[in-house]
């Protein structure tokens, strides 16, 4: 990975909210025949005893949906960078069947990776009454999550339960952010490409450093393509280990965050039960508003981190600091 090229990015993933006429542009509705295919594949996978995270296209055949899923991956990899698959009838299936359906579809986009120190490839995003601080992960809280990236090539979310209020999903183009910074504050790119240490939030072995071993660039380029890796909170939480950000670094981060929240930058979406959202983690930043659950039902998402060996943007990311030795970058280093 090398430093950022000082020229505007011209790709399909450079967009603002007004680039889209309506949500219909990113929603792909499942047809009855496609749903039937998925249900048959779910039954076959269950009968064969396949674990959801181990599914592959060959063990989860979807003849009527295969071409559509190929088109969706093209959108995620080379297009706007995100898509929502809508129409899966999650309410008529049990939890295991829903996991098989979600992981089976996701298998056409990439391989499920472990997401945390506990070794979980499938994570429940649900309020566990945990604080969102340097001792826990954001998926355990109902608090607002600022714009950030996750740990692998792609992020997948399946909605199994809606909140009483809040929980809006927001996405924005990291390539558009880069272009805007290049135009408005090009001098900030030095700090953004140098990067920052991240707090590992206890996701490491005893005796290991609580910080990332190296600075993680917010902007870097791999194969000539932008790779954005950002989460401000773990950057600031290094103060608990005796490291303070400089005034200049805080100024750059404040500008970056203000730019993320500039009106017209992000698209918003409300998840329905059965929705499956897939996002290119290296060109899209995502956020979530705070939410409130009802007494009788809760917001419940299931998350996958996916890696695709054919991704043009395949490079290291936050996966390395939360799951040491698990990511492809760590595996490559171990093989050297």
What are these regions (language model features)?
Residues 102-113:
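A short alpha->loop->secondary-structure connector
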Residues 96-103, 171-173:
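"Short basic amphipathic alpha-helical interaction patches in structured regions
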Residues 1-66, 70-72, 78, 83, ...:
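Active-site environment of non-heme Fe oxygenases that use a 2-His-1-carboxylate facial triad
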């Amino acid at each position: 990975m090398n430093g950022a090229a000082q020229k505007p990015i011209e790709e399909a993933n450079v967009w603002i909210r007004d680039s889209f006429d309506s949500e219909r542009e990113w929603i792909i509705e499942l047809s009855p025949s496609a749903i039937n295919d998925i249900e048959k594949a779910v039954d076959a996978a269950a009968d064969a005893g396949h674990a959801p995270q181990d599914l592959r296209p060959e063990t989860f055949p979807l003849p009527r949906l295969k071409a559509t899923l190929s088109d969706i991956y093209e959108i995620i990899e080379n297009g706007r960078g995100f898509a929502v698959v809508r129409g899966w009838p999650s309410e008529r299936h049990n939890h295991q069947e829903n996991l098989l359906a979600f992981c089976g579809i996701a298998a056409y986009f990439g391989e499920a990776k472990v997401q945390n120190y506990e070794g979980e490839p499938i994570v429940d995003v649900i309020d566990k009454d945990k604080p969102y601080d340097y001792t826990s992960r954001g998926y355990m809280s109902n608090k607002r999550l600022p714009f950030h990236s996750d740990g692998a090539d792609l992020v997948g979310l399946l909605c199994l339960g809606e909140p009483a209020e809040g929980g809006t999903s927001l996405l924005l183009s990291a390539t558009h952010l880069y272009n805007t910074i290049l135009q408005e504050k090009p001098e900030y790119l030095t700090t953004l490409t140098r990067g920052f240490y991240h707090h590992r939030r206890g996701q490491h072995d005893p005796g290991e450093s609580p910080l990332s071993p190296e600075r993680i660039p917010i902007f870097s380029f791999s194969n000539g393509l932008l790779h954005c890796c950002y989460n401000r909170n773990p950057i600031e939480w290094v103060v608990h280990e005796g490291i303070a950000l400089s005034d200049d670094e805080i100024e750059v981060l404040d500008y970056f965050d203000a730019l993320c929240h500039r009106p017209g930058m992000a698209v918003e979406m409300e998840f329905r039960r059965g929705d499956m959202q897939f996002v290119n983690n290296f060109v899209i930043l995502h956020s979530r508003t705070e939410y409130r659950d009802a007494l009788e039902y809760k917001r419940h998402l299931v998350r996958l981190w996916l890696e695709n060996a054919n991704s043009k943007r395949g490079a290291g990311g936050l996966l390395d600091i939360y799951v040491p030795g698990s990511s492809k970058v760590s595996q490559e280093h171990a093989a050297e």
